Amino acid sequence: MTTYGIGTQTPEQALDSLSDMTTDLTPIQNDEFHARIAKAQAYMQANNIDAIYLNAGTNLAYFTGMRWYASERLVGAILPAKGDVQYIAPFFEIGSLNDFMVIDGPIRGWQEHENPYQLCVEVLSEMGISKTGTLGIDESAQFFIYDGINKANGNYNIVNAQCVTAHCRMHKSANELALMQRAMDMTLEVHKATASMLYEGITTTEVEAFIKKAHQKVGAPGNYFCIVLF
């Protein structure tokens, strides 16, 4: 009777069967971040978009390499159609942003009593962007960011920046495809190893703990999202 690879070894044996699968991979390098920025700027120039605001989160990370979670405080970057990116953040976060910075650029800080949206308008003006220019807002940005910028200057032609971000992100580089494929390969190996150590009476928390260890064994930091249900 076949077991389809389920319950054929102990958890220790299953972990021992795994090894680091990331040693031959090349992480996204600075030149690729610069290429992403250049691609976005070329699209912006061709479509008459003067600048885009990148909010903390996936788009900020994709174009600048800076990993920062969105919160109730404005943290992001302004990418003009021509010129260098500039970051905007609470003044007290500037040191931390410098620690996480991958693509260099000035950080414009705002104090708690100041209006961060007015600072955005000032930065755009310093970039040479007219107060009637076209500004793309990150599609993942909270409404209060759009609202704040619009109140600081109601003359902008504000558009959804998704036309820029999606245009860039949906077309993957060879290195991106290799990283994505390896991530899927790693996940599949973890699934196989997990199936192989299942036994009658095992709990969901034990399986979840194994999955975390298995991901670490193949070279990942651990689980990003894991739910085990029987």
Which ranges hold each PLM region?
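Short, structural beta-strand-to-alpha-helix junction motif
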Residues: 142, 199-210
